[in-house]
């Protein structure tokens, strides 16, 4: 898979470069999720959902909001989750850069900074809010 070519397609459709990169990162994560054992245990939330419903470029978002159902949010579990997504034979790997705790008024979660890298070493930085 060539991430740069996918970015170029979205850019030609009118997305700004950073939004095109974010969209490709989201597409990769969603594809990997849909083909993983976690597909029935994760809810996609936030701007990704709104953008896909409205198809409005104004709704484009940089991060991906996920809600894990009956899955631990400790760092080892998050590393295992990403490791499982990386088992797909798509020549795209997700590398965790950093994990930080999130404390919101109604819940605690994690922000996972990741780098999505293709076989040509083209990469996109994004983050997952879990």
What are these regions (language model features)?
Residues 1-130:
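Compositionally biased terminal segments of proteins
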